[in-house]
């Protein structure tokens, strides 16, 4: 029995996939805490799909896909900030416009050059077949993101929580927003290998949303989100070996199940807890 349970660890490709998914899940969850605080979930969705044209162009010209995806994500984020700053359009309208435009452009590029582009890798990811050079890329991206987040997490918190107060203490909202979107784009690029373009949004939203239901303290929220992201990344890869299912699908399903548990049974915000309090108040 023990040998059966330890079987996935005997394969090098499984070991690589587990540790990469753990790192990606943890860092994406770190950023998801800020998306919850600011109410920017839709931006995470937009960036996760906006990298598709960058990946398609990179594949078409035999360039590192991470390079194309990163620059496409940065371009999308800067476009959102720029259009919002010069127009009277609401934020959700700008995000929806950029998201649909970039995604449509990506599909167009794929349709024009289908033979050179592995659509399945873009959509579903390919963590079990990840090459060593891609592992190094992801590891470097995650390390840089982690270091920058640990250095600037308090400044980002102030910018997201009270922009006016941040300006009075000498912080530049534009600089920190660009920094955040750069980090988010980098994490989306890394997560593409793990779960693919379609499910990236779950990794940058669900852990933060789950933690948001469990605590009112932001520092604790970050810790819970990172733990959930890392653990589901590791366990998801492990379980996918036995389920013979898509790794990204298993990871996101685990995150969704944990969210549903928090949604129902969170001590303060859970649906069951709220109904119990109403019954007590009524009595």
Which ranges hold each PLM region?
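Short loop segments and helix-boundary regions at transmembrane helix junctions
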Residues: 33-115, 212-223, 242-243
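Membrane-helix/interface signature in polytopic inner-membrane proteins
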Residues: 147-180
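Loop-to-transmembrane alpha-helix initiation sites
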Residues: 17-20, 66-71, 92, 96, ...
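Small-residue-rich segments of transmembrane alpha-helices in multi-pass membrane proteins
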Residues: 50-60, 97-109, 129-130, 173-178, ...
